[in-house]
């Protein structure tokens, strides 16, 4: 998709704050500091629309980005960040679960994992949660450029096995540096919009 117009519409914490719209929405879920902001910026060809932080746990709201008057990317808080209080983590969990299970406009979730590392228990639980609720999901393994190409398949296999990955789902190796995987991710989005 050729993206020229992107706007952060609202940062929401409750359903009554979600934008009133019929446009399809795609949620971006992943651990803190896994590369969600870089993924968004690569997909929409912007350097800093989604703020990239060195500090994990920066996104604390559901951020609704309207793209080309055609769809929304919804950046959800990163899960599994240890330095946030248990109460805060539970609040985020409820916020994310409420959005994913009740939002009619949600067409799919882009679950982002780091190709360099074995997925965590939180990653596994998120994937299981999406499968349980029959939410279409694509797993995007970011930071492929950070490891030698010779390790891509081995690491991808570890990610798939750890998540108990459903072969019917889409799995994409992604790099915000080289833009690898960008077209495949857009393809998943376009298919869900048809």
UniProtKB/Swiss-Prot annotation:
Q: Per UniProt, what is one GO molecular function of this protein?
A: metal ion binding
Entry coiled-coil feature ranges: none
Instruction: Output the GO biological process annotations, alphabetical, semicolon-separated.
Output: division septum assembly
**What residues does the EngB-type G domain cover?**
22-194
Q: Spell out the CDD domains in the cross-references.
A: YihA_EngB (cd01876)
**Where do the annotations place GTP binding?**
30-37, 57-61, 75-78, 142-145, 174-176
* Keyword Magnesium among record annotations: yes
Cofactor dependence is on: Mg(2+)
In the UniProt record, does the keyword Transferase occur?
no
Q: Which family does it belong to?
A: Belongs to the TRAFAC class TrmE-Era-EngA-EngB-Septin-like GTPase superfamily. EngB GTPase family.
* Protein name from the UniProt record: Probable GTP-binding protein EngB
Organism equals Listeria welshimeri serovar 6b (strain ATCC 35897 / DSM 20650 / CCUG 15529 / CIP 8149 / NCTC 11857 / SLCC 5334 / V8)
Q: What gene is behind this protein?
A: engB
